[in-house]
Structure formats: C-alpha cells, structure tokens
C-alpha cells in the first residue's frame, strides 16, 4: 500500500497570469486536507526557452503538473517531458475547449491570455472596486443609488470581504455596520435601487472571530462586551429585527465561505428578490 504523502509539489504552468490554474489547483488540493500542496507558479510562459527552465525545476522537485498553454508545441513538450520524468501532467482547459469545439463546430482561436483582454467587463470590475472602497464601513455619499447591493450587519459578519469579492465580479457593493444604540443612516432607508441584504451568524461564531481580531472603530463597545456572547446575541436580535422590519433578505454566514455568501447575494440579485427571508 502506498504511504499517504504529508506534502506534495504542485507545478502550475501558464501562458497568462495563472489565476485559472491556481483556482483549479487549490480547489482540488483542498480535498486532501492531510497533504499540503507546495505551489510552484510559472506565469507568462510563452517560449520554449522559458519552458525548458521551468521543466528543470520540475525535474528537481517532481510533483503534479497542471498547465494552461494554448501553443500546441509547448503543450506537447510539457506532456512529453513530464512522461519522461514520470510525473503526471494535465491540460486544465483542453477538455473544456474540446467540448466547446464539438458543440460549436469550430476550433478555438488559441490566443494566450485571451481572457484578460482590457474590455468593458474589465473596466466594470475596476469601477466596482473603486466604488466599494468609497462606500466601505458605513460611508454613504449621495451616489448611493448607484450601488447594486448594500450589505448590512453587525461587526465581524464578513461585510467588507464579501463586498470586495462582489466588486471583483463587477458588482457595486456598499456596506454599513449595524451597531446597537447607534442610529442607522437615514439615506439607507431612502435607497430605492440597491438590493439591501443583512448578514448574520451565530453568537458563538462571531465571538470567536472577535476574540482573534481587534475591536476596530466601534467606540461604544468595550472589549468585554464586544466578545460577550450575550451582548452579541442582543446585537444579532437588533440586526434581524431591523432587516425583517424593512423586508431585507438575511443570509446566515456562520458556515459559509466568502465565495458562498457572495454567490447567495448574486442569486438574490438575479432573482430580483427583495422580500424578507433567512437563508
């Protein structure tokens, strides 16, 4: 029986930025919690000379090789060299491209970094990121109607990270902290266009996070109250009541990753759902 590895080398070769590979590699590696992946990322590999140098590194530290290289000659070199070294190599996009070709009845153009063209979508994401930075942590200037979504919640419910993730998807997101005893900005209630959604979690989960992170800009709470579960439960009750009173959807983030929370918000946006609910 093969002894389980405590770590392994993961080589990622790309003719672009390597983001696609990194996401795919980490998604797969996450399924093997007992084996740590040592990542070797090689972006912008577009010549045989560059590739040969990469292959030398793989030979020195053998491991799984994933690649996204549109040049068929370079792809063949990777596969042949890896076979000679006795390490597995996988073209991550090839099965997808083959499916597209079969369905569309036409071959791909095979342009390196085609997904990173500076198009309208790229500039939309940049605009959304700028918007998020200007509307973080309760900053609500007069252009709040330009927001696609406004996230509300008590401290440490992942409002800012979720806003950043949404901005990277081109969604203009603002976020507002809900603090017991401090009035919510009136401009929030007047907003007509944006979807307003509340984030909550269990008191236990929030207490755990708060104990490991600084108090931040909440002068009305001392450290003891900030991490006390009873006090947190009161904050959560206030937040839930506020959301229910105004018909804002509620998402429990206790067991959700940032990506999963953002996906839930995107689903609400797609469905145009602004009815009060808890999910």
From Swiss-Prot:
The keyword Ribonucleoprotein does not apply. One of its GO terms (molecular function) is ADP binding. It comes from the Bacteria. Disulfide bonds: none annotated. It catalyses: N(tele)-phospho-L-histidyl/L-threonyl-[pyruvate, phosphate dikinase] + ADP = N(tele)-phospho-L-histidyl/O-phospho-L-threonyl-[pyruvate, phosphate dikinase] + AMP + H(+); N(tele)-phospho-L-histidyl/O-phospho-L-threonyl-[pyruvate, phosphate dikinase] + phosphate + H(+) = N(tele)-phospho-L-histidyl/L-threonyl-[pyruvate, phosphate dikinase] + diphosphate. The keyword Flavoprotein does not apply. Its EC number is 2.7.11.32, 2.7.4.27. It is an enzyme of class 2 (transferase). Keywords: Kinase, Nucleotide-binding, Serine/threonine-protein kinase, Transferase. ADP binds at residues 153-160. Belongs to the pyruvate, phosphate/water dikinase regulatory protein family. PDRP subfamily. Bifunctional serine/threonine kinase and phosphorylase involved in the regulation of the pyruvate, phosphate dikinase (PPDK) by catalyzing its phosphorylation/dephosphorylation. This is Putative pyruvate, phosphate dikinase regulatory protein. It comes from Brucella canis (strain ATCC 23365 / NCTC 10854 / RM-666).
């Amino acid at each position: 029986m093969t002894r389980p590895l405590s770590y392994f080398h993961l080589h990622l070769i790309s003719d672009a930025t390597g983001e696609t590979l990194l996401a795919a590699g980490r998604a797969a590696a996450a399924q093997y919690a007992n084996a740590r992946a040592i990542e070797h990322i090689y972006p912008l590999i577009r010549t045989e000379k560059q590739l040969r140098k990469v292959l030398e590194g793989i030979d020195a530290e053998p491991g799984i090789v994933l690649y996204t290289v549109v040049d068929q000659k370079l792809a063949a070199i990777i596969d042949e060299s890896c076979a000679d070294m006795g390490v597995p190599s996988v073209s991550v996009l090839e099965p997808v491209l083959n499916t597209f070709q079969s369905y569309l009845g036409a071959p791909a153009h095979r342009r390196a970094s085609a997904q990173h063209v500076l198009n309208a979508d790229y500039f939309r994401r940049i605009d959304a990121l700028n918007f998020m930075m200007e509307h973080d942590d309760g900053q609500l200037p007069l252009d709040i109607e330009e927001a696609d979504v406004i996230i509300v919640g008590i401290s440490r419910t992942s409002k800012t990270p979720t806003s950043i993730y949404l901005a990277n998807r081109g969604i203009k997101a603002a976020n507002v902290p809900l603090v017991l005893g401090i009035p919510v900005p009136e401009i929030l209630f007047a907003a007509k266009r944006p979807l307003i959604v509340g984030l909550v979690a269990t008191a236990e989960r929030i207490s755990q996070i708060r104990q490991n992170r600084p108090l931040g800009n909440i002068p009305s709470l001392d450290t003891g109250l900030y991490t006390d579960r009873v006090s947190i439960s009161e904050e959560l009750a206030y937040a839930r009541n506020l959301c229910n009173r105004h018909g804002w959807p509620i998402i429990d983030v206790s067991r959700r990753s940032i990506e999963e929370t953002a996906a839930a918000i995107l689903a609400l946006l797609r469905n145009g759902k602004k009815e009060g609910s808890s999910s």
